[in-house]
Amino acid sequence: MANAPVLLLKEGTQRSSGRDALKNNILAAVTLAEMLKSSLGPRGLDKMLIDSFGDVTITNDGATIVKEMEIQHPAAKLLVEAAKAQDAEVGDGTTSAVVLAGLLLDKADDLLDQNIHPTIIIEGYKKALNKSLEIIDQLATKIDVSNLNSLATRDQLKKIVYTTMSSKFIAGGEEMDKIMNMVIDAVSIVAEPLPEGGYNVPLDLIKIDKKKGGSIEDSMLVHGLVLDKEVVHPGMPRRVEKAKIAVLDAALEVEKPEISAKISITSPEQIKAFLDEEAKYLKDMVDKLASIGANVVICQKGIDDVAQHFLAKKGILAVRRVKRSDIEKLEKALGARIISSIKDATPEDLGYAELVEERRVGNDKMVFIEGAKNPKAVNILLRGSNDMALDEAERSINDALHSLRNVLMKPMIVAGGGAVETELALRLREYARSVGGKEQLAIEKFAEALEEIPMILAETAGMEPIQTLMDLRAKHAKGLINAGVDVMNGKIADDMLALNVLEPVRVKAQVLKSAVEAATAILKIDDLIAAAPLKSGEKKGEKKEGGEEEKSSTPSSLE
C-alpha cells in the first residue's frame, strides 16, 4: 500500500511543478515582451494584426497590440493584465510595462540558474522598486500649471504631448501641431482645480468622433458637441443661432399603457375624436416647449411624426434617438438640465449655444452644437483619408489626453530617452551594496533590466546598443543625470529636458509598479496544472450518470 500511486487529478490533466513550471511561465512572458520590444519609442516599428474576421490593424500602441492578440498561455496573460492595468491607471506606457516585466523575468531566470530562491528574488525586486520610486521623486522637475491659459504653461504642456505622440502614425508637421493644440485646449476646458493643487481631468467629458474624408488637418475641436444624427423633419430649420436648447430624456410620443388595453370604437366619429385627442396631447407638449423659449430640442427617445409636424410649424429644430452618454455631455456642455417631465419644464432647464447647425461631413449629415458659454464637455471631430489612419490618430489623441491628465494631476516631469532608467540603474547598484546578501544580486539584476530600455531605444534608432549604454553610463557617472538617447538624431544627448523629451512622473512610476507586479506574480507560481480539454459535446460541470456533478477528482496517476 505504501507504494501505491495517489490518484488525484482527472485523466488527461497535465502538471508541471517546481523549476519546470517556473521556466515555462518565464519563457512565455519573455516571448511576449520580445514581440513588443521593437515597438518601443519614437522610432518603434508597427505591428500588423489580422483578426479571425480578416480585419487589419496596424499600430505600435502596446495596449492595442496586446488587446488584439489572442494570447493563450496563462503566464503571458498575466503580462496582458499588467498592460491593461497600466492603460486603465495612466493610459500610457503599456509597451514599456510589458517589456520591462519581460526583462525582469529574463534576469530572474539567470538568478534561478544560480539556485537563488524565487522568494529572495521577489523581495529584492520589491526593495528595488521602492528605492526607484524614491529616486524618481528626487530626479523629478516640478512644473507650474497654475494658469492653464498662460503661454509658458501651454508651451510646457505641448512638449509633454509631443513626447507622447512622437512615436505615433500622425507624428510630424502641421498635422501634429494642430492635434496638439486641440488636445491642450480640450483638457484646459474640462480640467477641474483640486484644493491640494493640480487638476482633476475627467476625460469622459472629451468626446472623440471619427469621420472618413479629408485629412487630419481638417479635424476640429467643437466647444460643445457633435451629434451623428440628422434633423428629424425636412420642414425644420437647418441652422439656429443663439439656440435655447431643451435636452429631453422623455419621449415626444403618446405613451403606451404599461398594462395591455383595448379601446372599443363603434363609429367613425370616435376614431376621429381619438386621433384628435392624440394630436392635441402632442401639440400641448410642443406648445409647452415653445412657451419656455426652446428653439432646439434634443431628445434621447423618439419623436412622433405628428409632434415633428408641430415642431416644424413652430420653427424648432429637433434631433431624436441621441445616446444617453451624449445627453449627459450636453448637460455639462450647455449648462442645461435634463428634462424628464415636459409639463414641468421651465426656462431655467434650457441650455445655450451660439449655433446649432446640420452639416454634411463626408457622406453623412451631423448636427453641430457650438459656442456654449462655459462648456464643461467638448468634442474632437477627427477627419482622415482612411479608417486605419483615423484609428491610429484616435489612439494618439487618447495617449496625449492621458499624458496631460497625468501631468496635471501630479505636475512633475522627468527626462525621457532612457535617462531615468540609466540613472536609476547607477543608483540602484550603489543601494544594492548597502543591502547585502542574496537580495543584493536581485537588485543588481533589476538595474540591468532597466539599462536594457535605453539599449532598445538605441536599437530601434539604428544605433549600436552596447556602445550607447557604455557612453550613457559614462555620462551619468560624471553627474549628467538627464543624459539619454536622442533617437530622432541618432546620438546621445547630455540633457533630454533641453530637447523637450519629457515624461510625466506618474506614468514612469506606474510603469515600474505594473512591471514588478506582473513579474513577481509569475515568479510566485511553482505549480502548473492544466485540466484536460473537454470532449466534444461535453459541457463544464456536466452531470454524469448517477446524478453526481463531475469534478476534477477523476483519477490520474501521480507517483
Curated annotation (Swiss-Prot):
SUPFAM superfamilies in the record: GroEL apical domain-like (SSF52029), GroEL equatorial domain-like (SSF48592), GroEL-intermediate domain like (SSF54849)
Disulphide-bonded residues: none
Cross-referenced InterPro entries: Chaperone_TCP-1 (IPR017998), Chaperonin_TCP-1_CS (IPR002194), Cpn60/GroEL/TCP-1 (IPR002423), GroEL-like_apical_dom_sf (IPR027409), GROEL-like_equatorial_sf (IPR027413), TCP-1-like_intermed_sf (IPR027410), TCP-1_chaperonin (IPR053374), thermosome_alpha (IPR054827)
Region described as Disordered: 536-559
Regions of compositional bias (Basic and acidic residues) in chain numbering: 536-552
Family matches, as PROSITE patterns: TCP1_1 (PS00750), TCP1_2 (PS00751), TCP1_3 (PS00995)
Keyword ATP-binding applies: yes
CDD domains cross-referenced by the UniProt entry: cpn60
UniProt GO molecular function: ATP binding; ATP hydrolysis activity; ATP-dependent protein folding chaperone; unfolded protein binding
Subunit structure, as described in the record: Forms a Heterooligomeric complex of two stacked nine-membered rings; one of alpha and the other of beta subunits.
Protein family membership: Belongs to the TCP-1 chaperonin family.
Protein name in the entry: Thermosome subunit alpha
Gene behind the chain: thsA
